[in-house]
Design a protein with these regions (language model features):
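Flexible glycine/proline-rich, aromatic-decorated loop/lid segments
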Residues: 34-37, 272-307
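Long, well-ordered, tryptophan-enriched scaffold segments
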Residues: 22-25, 29, 34-124
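Long, contiguous, secondary-structure-rich segments that constitute the structural scaffold
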Residues: 310, 320-371, 460, 466-480, ...
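Extended redox/cofactor-interaction regions of prokaryotic respiratory oxidoreductases
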Residues: 1-20, 24-31, 55-59, 153-276, ...
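Acidic/polar loop patches that form or flank catalytic/metal-binding clefts of enzymes
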Residues: 72-73, 115, 129, 157-167, ...
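Short beta-alpha connecting loops at secondary-structure transitions
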Residues: 42-49, 285-292, 302-313, 466
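A glycine-rich phosphate-binding loop feature that marks nucleotide/adenosyl-phosphate handling sites
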Residues: 78-80, 121, 164-175, 340-354, ...
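Active-site phosphate/pyrophosphate-binding segments
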Residues: 61, 81-216
Length: 590
């Protein structure tokens, strides 16, 4: 996990807590196919699990706690709903298969004795289960989180200092104490009374992971979170604030579907892979070229910062607000969109809206001019926030502090979800075999792909700037490969290799390392898609991991993306290297 990123600005104040944890000498485990940077820093004990099988391991750990009498039934009885139904799954009453450590060992690649020892070690000590946001981007990704909460409940430490579980420590100062002050908002995202020019057909809002499927199948109906959604017939795409040609699985399939609409418009500050697939590009200013305002720390809310314009807009770029105000004007609803405010007037309003809540926090925020001239305002951190324990109030009195669940308790079994009768997400957490992974290895595609976030990027942002060279090999995205897998393929560090799946192929630069388990490769997510014709066919020559991944929903419940799932093969590249051109400005059609 990393903590160097945020939706807004950040003080990186959580890093101090990680340093303190290391200094204290607290034992940590890294249960991951990859020995990541956090594990390296903490010198964690590595439990190298097969990709997508963590859920089976946790089920087996709960089984071990239950059959040895160590599951905390006092906690389960008082604070959870559905243990009886989940236990039936655990003991094989549903499918005839007991979820024993031996069962999980065959799936996960972890020895049964290791699973047993891990379960007892977690029970014997005050244990915090910490996860990032990559694990849900696998097939059946919802199950991991549900099973993790179930494991935490069986351990019985939820609501105790240093115990329980947490899900957002990897970014935005997650885990840092919450400061005493209002969160700074933004321009409202819902503008009334704007309505479609023509009667709308299909769902008005789609989850972003549906984009390819929706473009391919207009009018199709899909199950989603207990409801039905109908894909509209997209005639035009207007994309801002994202780079689907980096973040969406099976990029070559997306490329084909992207051609179906009549017109594609992209607003961005750089020539991303997505901008290169647009008919019209509206060049937006960078943060240096216009004024803005931001909270400091998404999770910690440390204060407010004035983002002063440093230089005038370069070339033909304009601020996003100017671009959309002008479009609204052309469409006849400028007043409804702008509410009669300039960009600077919106910034002042946003600040004053927050300042208007000062009394709630018993603080006195400066007037806007004082704030803007100084450039920032920091909130104090109360001692109570430094001592905050997640779910402590719930543990103290679950009836007075009900959770936002069906029962008000920790929902181990959900009658609501069970009522959907989905075959890929039942009423409780359970293990499903991923569509691709270690267990699905074939002679043609024997390796499992992992695609974690890149160390030098935020998703695909910053791949185009000079610091990309800090990690590239021959201008290609690195691929981590275990020495055993590299030796059998006569690959050494520094070689350019071809990585191929059933869906596509890409070039990458080999890094031979023990930090990835045998049978698994790692290509960090976020390289820019750069397809070229080569003697080996049309391939991505820069190394976008999603050129390889499978595009299917996690399940009918969340329909999330599975951008870290795929079977691949790696071979040494012996042909002439095609140049990487995705960072070179394309020629414009005038």
């Amino acid at each position: 996990m990393t903590n160097d990123i945020d939706w807004y600005t950040t003080l990186h104040n959580y890093a101090g807590y990680m340093r303190a944890l290391k200094k204290k000498g607290t034992k940590t485990y890294c249960i991951n196919p990859v020995y990541n940077d956090t594990a390296e820093y903490m010198k964690s004990e590595w439990v190298a699990v097969n990709p997508g099988t963590d859920t089976a391991v946790m089920a087996a750990m709960i089984y071990e706690l239950e059959v040895t009498g160590e599951a905390d039934h006092a906690f389960l009885d008082k604070y959870t709903a559905g243990w009886k139904e989940f236990r039936a799954y655990l003991m094989g009453d549903e499918d005839g298969v007991k979820k024993t450590p031996e069962w999980a060992a065959k799936i996960s690649g972890i020895k049964a004795e290791t699973i047993k020892a891990l379960a007892h070690d977690l029970k014997a000590h005050r244990t915090m289960l910490m996860i990032g946001w990559g694990i849900q981007r696998i097939d059946y990704g919802e199950q991991f989180h549900w099973m993790l909460v179930t494991l935490a409940a069986a351990l019985g430490q939820i609501g105790l200092p240093g115990g329980g579980f947490g899900t957002s420590y990897h970014y935005s100062s997650g885990g840092a104490p919450l400061a005493n002050g209002p969160f700074v908002g933004g321009i409202p995202s819902k503008v009334d009374p704007i309505r479609p020019v023509k009667p709308w057909q299909g769902s008005k809002v789609l989850h972003v992971a549906a984009i390819t499927d929706a473009l391919e199948h207009p009018g199709a109906v899909r199950d989603f979170d207990g409801k039905k959604e109908t894909y509209p017939h997209f005639r035009m795409i207007m994309w801002a604030g994202g780079n689907p040609f980096a973040h969406h699985p099976d990029t070559f399939r997306l490329e084909r579907a992207w051609k179906k609409p009549d017109t594609v418009v992209v607003t961005d500050v750089v020539w991303t892979a997505t901008a290169r697939h647009a008919d019209i590009v509206l060049p937006a200013c960078t943060l240096l070229e216009h004024n803005d305002i931001s909270v400091i720390g998404t999770n910690s809310c440390d204060g407010v910062v004035a983002m002063h314009q440093a230089i005038k807009p370069q070339y033909e770029s304009r601020s996003d607000y100017w671009i959309y105000s002008q479009l609204a004007k052309k469409l006849g609803f400028e007043k409804e969109f702008t509410e009669g405010r300039t960009e600077m007037q919106w910034i002042e309003k946003i600040y004053n809206d927050a300042r208007g809540m000062s009394d709630v926090y018993d603080i006195t925020m400066p007037d806007f001019k004082t704030f803007w001239d100084k450039g920032f305002y920091l909130y104090d951190v109360p001692e109570a926030a430094r001592q905050y324990v997640s779910f402590a109030e719930f543990r103290a009195d679950p009836q007075a502090n009900k959770l936002n669940t069906e029962s008000g308790l920790i929902q181990l079994y959900s009658p609501k979800i069970a009522g959907y009768k989905y075959d890929d997400c039942r009423g409780h957490a359970m293990y499903f075999k991923p569509a691709e992974g270690t267990a699905s290895a074939t002679k043609e595609y024997p390796l499992a792909l992992m695609a974690p976030k890149g160390r030098y990027r935020m998703h695909s942002q910053l791949d185009c700037v000079n610091n990309r060279q800090r990690g590239k090999i021959e201008d290609r995205e690195p691929v981590w490969i275990n020495p055993k897998d590299a030796a059998s393929r006569k690959i050494v560090s520094g070689d350019v290799v071809l990585v191929k799946s059933r869906r596509g192929a890409m070039l990458a630069g080999a890094i031979v390392t023990e930090r990835v388990k045998p049978g698994v490769i790692v290509v960090q997510h976020g390289a820019w898609f750069d397809p070229k014709k080569t003697p080996k066919g049309r391939i991505d020559v820069e190394g976008n991991s999603n050129s390889l991944t499978i595009d299917k929903p996690t399940s009918k419940l969340a329909r999330g993306n599975v951008s870290s799932t795929g079977n691949v093969e790696v071979t040494k590249w012996t042909d002439e290297l095609p140049p990487v051109m995705v960072f070179v400005q394309p020629r414009r059609k005038l």
